[in-house]
UniProtKB/Swiss-Prot annotation:
The gene is cobW. CDD domains: CobW-like. GO terms for cellular component: cytoplasm. The keyword Chaperone applies. The keyword Chaperone applies. Zinc chaperone that directly transfers zinc cofactor to target proteins, thereby activating them. Zinc is transferred from the CXCC motif in the GTPase domain to the zinc binding site in target proteins in a process requiring GTP hydrolysis. Residues 177-192 have a biased composition (Basic and acidic residues). A motif (CXCC motif) lies at residues 101-104. This is Zinc chaperone CobW.
């Protein structure tokens, strides 16, 4: 299997000259703070990280992205800072760990990256880690107890991003209709759902919970979501509301939680499993390449697609005729968000590429349906 690491990469905001270059004595290096961002598929983790990078204010940040799927869409998004960023700066800031789950590949994938970043910690102020929406955060936090990491890094906080409208509708799971049917038949079955357990485990590991997409709910619905989430959390865990992950960096960084010291005392559903036997739901992922497409036609075609197939997540980029900017498309279930994220580069082919994630997918049928609808 080819090594999925694409590095070495560090965010290229470096306004502070190195002390050695100034002829100043070297200070003893403090522990490097690490923020772990977790949350279910489509909650808005990548959007949050992009907001943090765009507002870094000189902080030298390295990013590790753990994606599910063969196409590094999240890594590509994070390599683009605010519109107008130079192409040179846009490269070399992100490590991508693809086709895996950090909770299962800590030693073979995550550890080599951390070893490299530890060696370079004098050039860094912060590490951000975005986990896959299918990952368990607790084993990742526990990895920071290892001697080679714990002496150099500390987990400043685990931030869990929650899709507020999905929770309000009871549709954070991949198959809301099935969940509702199970809930009607036996309320206890929902709590034994692997997806529900994953959601609860992500909350159990949190030092800060973000109720994202809060602008899409009225005050009453948002209050219900807050109460539901608060019922899953220790009283000390703070809950904040956000729209598109837009929060001041002092809210997100500098929490000093030292989560690696306390994570063992946070019970989760998977504590008594041998992690080598940890079983994820079987998900398929593949990408579909298309030419330029009309925005309205694309959204209609994607809506029809999720009606006919067991699709959990669609994410990618689209080229819209006559538009100089690339359209970022992200969908969970029947809900699709889109916005223009940056201009097409001069040497970049204007094309559409979508990643589809789901269960028992007929890849040929899905690709043919899309191409026929958009022909």
């Amino acid at each position: 299997m080819a090594n999925p690491l694409r590095g070495p990469c560090v965010r290229a905001t470096r306004p502070h000259a190195r002390r050695a270059e100034q002829g100043l004595p070297m200070k003893t290096l403090a522990k490097l703070p690490v923020t772990i961002v977790t949350g279910f598929l489509g909650a808005g983790k990548t959007t949050l990280l992009r907001h943090m990078l765009d507002n870094a204010e000189g902080r030298r940040i390295a990013v590790i992205v753990n994606e599910f799927g063969e196409l590094g869409i999240d890594g590509e998004i994070l390599k683009q800072c605010s519109i107008g960023c130079s192409e040179e700066e846009a490269q070399g800031r992100v490590f991508e760990l693809a086709n895996g789950c950090l909770c299962c590949t800590v030693q073979e994938e995550f550890f080599p990256v951390m070893r490299e970043l530890v060696a370079r910690r004098g050039d860094l102020d912060q590490i951000l880690i975005e986990t896959s929406g299918l990952a368990l955060p607790k084993p990742l936090v526990q990895a920071f107890q290892w001697p080679e990491i714990r002496n150099a890094c500390t987990v400043d906080a685990v931030i869990t991003v929650v899709d507020s409208p999905a929770v309000a509708a009871g549709t954070f799971a991949a198959h809301p209709e099935q969940v509702d049917q199970q809930r009607r038949q036996d309320p206890n079955l929902d709590h034994e759902s692997p997806l529900h357990e994953l959601f609860e485990d992500q909350l159990a590991s949190a030092d800060l919970v973000i109720l994202n997409k809060a602008d899409q709910l009225d005050a009453e619905a948002l209050a219900r979501v807050r109460a539901e989430i608060a019922g899953e959390l220790p009283a000390a865990v703070k809950i904040v509301e956000a729209s598109r992950g837009e929060l001041p960096l002092p809210v997100l960084l500098g929490l000093n939680a030292e989560a690696e010291l306390h994570i063992d005392g946070r019970p989760t559903h998977h504590d008594h499993e041998g992690h080598e036997d940890h079983d994820h739901d079987e998900f398929d992922s593949f990408h579909v390449d298309l030419p330029e497409v009309e925005e309205a036609a694309l959204l209609e075609a994607l809506g029809e697609l999720v009606e006919r197939h067991d699709i959990l997540r669609i994410k990618g980029f689209a080229a819209i005729p006559g538009k100089p900017m690339r359209l970022l498309v992200q969908g969970v279930g029947k809900r699709f968000d889109r916005h223009f994220d940056r201009k097409w580069l001069a040497d970049e082919a204007r094309s559409t590429r979508l990643v589809v994630i789901g269960q028992e997918l007929d890849q040929a049928a899905i690709a043919n349906q899309l191409r026929t609808a958009l022909a």
